[in-house]
A protein has these predicted regions:
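Carbohydrate-binding surfaces of carbohydrate-active enzymes
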Residues: 72, 118, 123-555
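Polysaccharide-binding and catalytic clefts of secreted carbohydrate-active enzymes
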Residues: 1-139, 143
C-alpha cells in the first residue's frame, strides 16, 4: 500500500538513455525512426501505445526499474542497521482493477528478486470479492513465491483476516490452510478484537471465529517446524506472468477473470502449479518444467525464443485466446506464432459477453459462440480469437484442428514441433469451465453460508476440465485424492514433509484416500488436528472436513 518512486526532474532524460545503453539497446529500439540518442526522451504518456509503441514500452520498463532501485536504496540502509529484519509493505490485491489477484510482475516478483524489499506481504480480503472462488486467494501467495524463488531468507508475511461480520470461520480456515500450503511463513490476523475495542472498521465479534482461530493455531504448532524451515515443493507445470504483458494491459476486459478461472481449474485437477516470468525463460528455469500455460497476448521476443526452443525440446505449451501473438512492441510475435502454427486475424470481445468477476457477471453474460469437442459442449465468453493456420503449417500437414466454431474457423489446434507440442484455444477455457457453476442470484456479501460471496462452486463443465487437463495428462501427480476438488500442497523441509489439504466443497469427505507419489518419508504419519489417519504403503485414509495437514517427520 505504497507507491514505487517515479522518475522525474532534469536528470531523468539522461538516466533513461544511460539505462537503455546499459541493456545493449540502440536508439532504434526506443524509436523506430531514431538513430541518435539525443532524440530519445523518457515519455510516460499512455498515448504512445499507438504512436510510438517502442518508446511506450521502454519508458514503462524504465519507470518500473527506477522505482525498484530507489526503493532498494532505502531498504539497503535499513538492512545495514537491522540485518535480521524483514523489510516490506502490504500489497493490496484489489487494485488496479485489471490486476485483482493477478499482481503486476515488477511489484510482486521483481521487487523481491532484486531485494528492493525483503519481506513479501499481502492480504486475503477475497471474502469481499465476487471472483470465481475464494481459492483465487492463493494466486497472491504463488506470485510472492515466484518472487522469493532462490531467496531462502525471505519469508512471506500474510494477513489472514478473521473479520466477522464479512468472513466466516469455515472460509477463514480454508484461506489460512491454503496460505500455509502456498508458502506463508508469517501469519498476521490484523484486527482481531471485538467491535467494542477495535480501532478500525474491521473487528471480530463472533465467538465461533475465535474458537476456530485458536484451534487452527494449535494445529499449526504441530507442523510449524516444517513451515518455518521449508518451502512448497516445485511442480512440473507453470503459468506464465510477465512485465511485458502488464505494460500492454493484457488483463483488461475478460482476460483477468479468464486467467483466474484457468488457474483454479488447473489446481482443481491436482496439478501443482508454479508461476514463471521472463527471467525464468532466459535464465533456464523453464527447462525444469514440462508444461506451460500461456494466457498473455504480449511476450517479449527474448522470452518467446526460449519458450519456442523449450517446446522443440519436448515441452507442452497450452495457449488461450490470443496468447503469444504479439511481442513487446505490439508487433506480430514470429517465434510464438510459428510454434503454435497460427496467425491471429482479430479478437472479438462483445460487450454483452464480458466478465469482470465471475460470480456477479458470468451467470448473466451471453455466450459468443458454442463449440463441440470430445463428446461435450463448450460455451465461449469474454473473447474469441479468429485464427488462421500459417502457410508452413498447412504445407507440413502436422497440425490438427481438434475443434471448430460453427462457421468453420479453428477453435482448438494441436501443433507438434520437433519433440514438443502446442495446444491453442481460440477462446478462454477457464470461463467455459465455470459456466453454470455459479447460480444467477444477487451478489450477497454477508457472512451467511448461503451468501454468494461464500458460495463454493462445484458443478463445473466437464468438457472444459478435460481440455484444461490435456497438456498435463502425462504428468505424474505427487498426490491424488479419491474425492474431487481437494487441493493438496506439499511443504518440504529438512525436518519433514507436510501435505496441506483444503476441501473446496461443503461435503465432509469420510474415508478420503490420499495416494502418495514419490519422495515422501516412510513410517508413521499424523494429522495436525489429532484425528485418526491410517497408512498402508503409499495410501493414507482419513476424514476431511474443511482443511487439514498430514505430517511426516524426519525425526
Amino acid at each position: 500500500e505504497i507507491s514505487l518512486p517515479r522518475p522525474g526532474g532534469k536528470d531523468a532524460e539522461e538516466a533513461f538513455r544511460q539505462w537503455m545503453q546499459s541493456k545493449g539497446l540502440s536508439p532504434a529500439d526506443a524509436s523506430k525512426d531514431s538513430s541518435k540518442w539525443s532524440n530519445i526522451s523518457l515519455d510516460l504518456n499512455p498515448g504512445l501505445r499507438n504512436s510510438n509503441p517502442n518508446l511506450f514500452y521502454w519508458s514503462r520498463r524504465y519507470q518500473h526499474q527506477f522505482g525498484i532501485l530507489k526503493t532498494k536504496e532505502r531498504t539497503d540502509i535499513l538492512r545495514k542497521h537491522l540485518p535480521n529484519a524483514g523489510i516490506g509493505a502490504n500489497y493490496s490485491p484489489h487494485y488496479p482493477t485489471e490486476h485483482r489477484y493477478l499482481g503486476e510482475v515488477h511489484k510482486w516478483v521483481t521487487t523481491f528478486r532484486q531485494e528492493a524489499m525483503t519481506q513479501p506481504w499481502s492480504e486475503d480480503y477475497i471474502f469481499q470479492m465476487p471472483v470465481c472462488t475464494p481459492q483465487v486467494n492463493n494466486i497472491n501467495l504463488d506470485l510472492l513465491r515466484a518472487g522469493v524463488r532462490g531467496k531462502a531468507k525471505q519469508k512471506i508475511h500474510y494477513y489472514c483476516m478473521a473479520h466477522w461480520p464479512s468472513n466466516r470461520p469455515d472460509t477463514w480456515r480454508r484461506l489460512f490452510y491454503g496460505a500455509l500450503g502456498h508458502g506463508m511463513q508469517i501469519v498476521n490476523l490484523f484486527e482481531f478484537r471485538p467491535v467494542q475495542v477495535a480501532y478500525t472498521e474491521n473487528h471480530v465479534t463472533h465467538k465461533d471465529t475465535y474458537a476456530e482461530v485458536l484451534k487452527a493455531f494449535r494445529e499449526l504448532g504441530t507442523f510449524e517446524h516444517i513451515v518455518q524451515t521449508g518451502r512448497p515443493r516445485f511442480g512440473q507445470a507453470a503459468l506464465w506472468f510477465s512485465e511485458t504483458s502488464d505494460i500492454w494491459g493484457d488483463n483488461e476486459g475478460s482476460f483477468a477473470a479468464a486467467k483466474r478461472t484457468l488457474y483454479t481449474a488447473i489446481r482443481q485437477q491436482e496439478i501443482p502449479l508454479d508461476f514463471l516470468v521472463e527471467a525464468d525463460a532466459t535464465a533456464g528455469t523453464l527447462a525444469k518444467y514440462k508444461v506451460l500455460y500461456l494466457t498473455d497476448r504480449h511476450v517479449s521476443n527474448a522470452a518467446s525464443k526460449h519458450i519456442s526452443e523449450w517446446v522443440k525440446n519436448g515441452g507442452i505449451l497450452f495457449c488461450t485466446a490470443g496468447a503469444g501473438m504479439f511481442d513487446e512492441y505490439n508487433n506480430p510475435n514470429a517465434s510464438l506464432r510459428s510454434i503454435q502454427g497460427v496467425d491471429l486475424q482479430s479478437i472479438i470481445e462483445p460487450k454483452e459477453s464480458q466478465v469482470s468477476m465471475v460470480k456477479q457477471d458470468l451467470p448473466f453474460a451471453k455466450p459468443i459462440d458454442t463449440i463441440k469437442w470430445n463428446g461435450g459442449r463448450l460455451e465461449i465468453f469474454g473473447a474469441k480469437a479468429i485464427l488462421q493456420l500459417r502457410k508452413p503449417t498447412l504445407l507440413s500437414k502436422k497440425a490438427k484442428i481438434l475443434a471448430s466454431f460453427p462457421n468453420g474457423s479453428p477453435a482448438l489446434i494441436k501443433h507438434p514441433s520437433a519433440k514438443g507440442t502446442s495446444y491453442t484455444c481460440a477462446f478462454l477455457p477457464g470461463l467455459s469451465y465455470y459456466r453454470n457453476a455459479t447460480p444467477m442470484v444477487p451478489v450477497d456479501r454477508s457472512s451467511s453460508i448461503k451468501s454468494l460471496i461464500h458460495f463454493l462452486p462445484t458443478q463445473f463443465n466437464d468438457t472444459a476440465r478435460i481440455l484444461i487437463d490435456l497438456p498435463a495428462k502425462s504428468l505424474t501427480k505427487p498426490v491424488r485424492c479419491s474425492a474431487p476438488l481437494i487441493e493438496s500442497c506439499i511443504l518440504d523441509s529438512p525436518k519433514g514433509t507436510a501435505i496441506v489439504l483444503v476441501n473446496w466443497t461443503r461435503e465432509i469427505q469420510k474415508g478420503l484416500t490420499v495416494i502418495l507419489g514419490q519422495n515422501f518419508p516412510p513410517g508413521p504419519v499424523r494429522l495436525a488436528s489429532g484425528q485418526a489417519v491410517n497408512r498402508s504403503g503409499n495410501r493414507l485414509t482419513l476424514d476431511l472436513n474443511i482443511a487439514e495437514s498430514i505430517i511426516f517427520n524426519n525425526f
